[in-house]
């Protein structure tokens, strides 16, 4: 079984976006710790299966980050289930999780399921709109959500999601300081090796997503920047 505590870097791929097979191969063989498949727009069973089947040709762990119940398909190494702690809508905190367990609980291995305590901070990102996240929050609120994730809910992952914008690095450092057992994932604005290395000093795992589609070669360099620290 894969241990996220040992990870430092993941690529997040959107099944609704096109990526040439040659680039996908380079990502999968880059040394990244996992390929996470997920997104906010038009995530369907068909496009999830299509991308998973391509990633499955390689040895890298393949993870589905579940955003819709309809996109849950067998064949992934792990299933990340986001619980958006700062969502105004209960469905995104526990409601959809209940529905997923109701429909698929008997079919899924619980060892393959990893719950992420999400805190979405960028007010302009699609994930914030989709989940109705309260992004008008202070530093103290983010730290409180981190403590909720670890100490009250005992979640293995706390995911600080800036999705397209770069966080204040002091925010990441402060968040890491209040976590002991929960693994800190950071995503948002990581577009080159220098930024990845800088944020990788504080976050346990750096997530690189948009950069794959915007500047592939720079995105690829983030692996070595984080993994050799």
Curated annotation (Swiss-Prot):
GO terms for biological process: glycerophospholipid biosynthetic process. It catalyses: sn-glycerol 1-phosphate + all-trans-heptaprenyl diphosphate = 3-heptaprenyl-sn-glycero-1-phosphate + diphosphate. Belongs to the GGGP/HepGP synthase family. Group I subfamily. CDD domains: PcrB_like. It comes from the Bacteria. Pathway: Membrane lipid metabolism; glycerophospholipid metabolism. It comes from Bacillus velezensis (strain DSM 23117 / BGSC 10A6 / LMG 26770 / FZB42). Its cofactor is Mg(2+). The keyword Coiled coil does not apply. Its EC number is 2.5.1.n9. Sn-glycerol 1-phosphate binds at residues 12, 159-164, 189, 209-210. Homodimer. This is Heptaprenylglyceryl phosphate synthase. Mg(2+) binds at residues 14, 40. One of its GO terms (molecular function) is magnesium ion binding. Prenyltransferase that catalyzes in vivo the transfer of the heptaprenyl moiety of heptaprenyl pyrophosphate (HepPP; 35 carbon atoms) to the C3 hydroxyl of sn-glycerol-1-phosphate (G1P), producing heptaprenylglyceryl phosphate (HepGP). This reaction is an ether-bond-formation step in the biosynthesis of archaea-type G1P-based membrane lipids found in Bacillales. The gene is pcrB. PANTHER family: HEPTAPRENYLGLYCERYL PHOSPHATE SYNTHASE, PTHR40029. NCBIfam families: GGGP-family (TIGR01768), PRK04169.1-1 (NF003197), PRK04169.1-3 (NF003199). It is an enzyme of class 2 (transferase). Keywords: Lipid biosynthesis, Lipid metabolism, Magnesium, Metal-binding, Phospholipid biosynthesis, Phospholipid metabolism, Transferase.
């Amino acid at each position: 079984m894969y241990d996220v505590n040992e990870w430092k870097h993941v690529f997040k791929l959107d099944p609704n976006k096109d990526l040439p097979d040659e680039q996908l191969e380079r990502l999968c063989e880059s040394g990244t710790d996992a390929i996470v498949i997920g997104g906010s727009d038009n995530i369907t069973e068909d496009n999830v299966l299509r991308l998973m089947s391509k990633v499955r040709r390689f040895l890298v762990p393949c993870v589905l980050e579940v955003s819709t119940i309809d996109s849950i398909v067998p064949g992934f190494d792990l299933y990340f289930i986001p619980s958006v702690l700062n969502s105004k809508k209960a469905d995104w905190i526990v409601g959809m999780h209940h529905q997923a367990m109701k429909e698929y609980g008997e079919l899924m291995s619980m060892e393959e399921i990893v719950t992420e305590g999400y805190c979405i901070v960028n007010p302009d990102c699609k994930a914030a709109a989709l989940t109705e996240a309260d992004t008008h929050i202070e530093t103290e609120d983010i730290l409180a959500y981190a403590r909720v994730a670890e100490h009250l809910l005992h979640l293995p992952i706390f995911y600080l999601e800036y999705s397209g914008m770069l966080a204040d690095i002091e925010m990441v450092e402060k968040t890491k300081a209040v976590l002991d057992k929960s693994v800190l994932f950071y995503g948002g604005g990581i577009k080159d090796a220098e930024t990845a290395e800088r944020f990788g000093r504080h976050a346990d795992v750096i997530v690189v997503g948009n950069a794959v589609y915007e500047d592939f070669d720079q995105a690829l360099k983030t692996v070595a920047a984080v993994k050799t620290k």
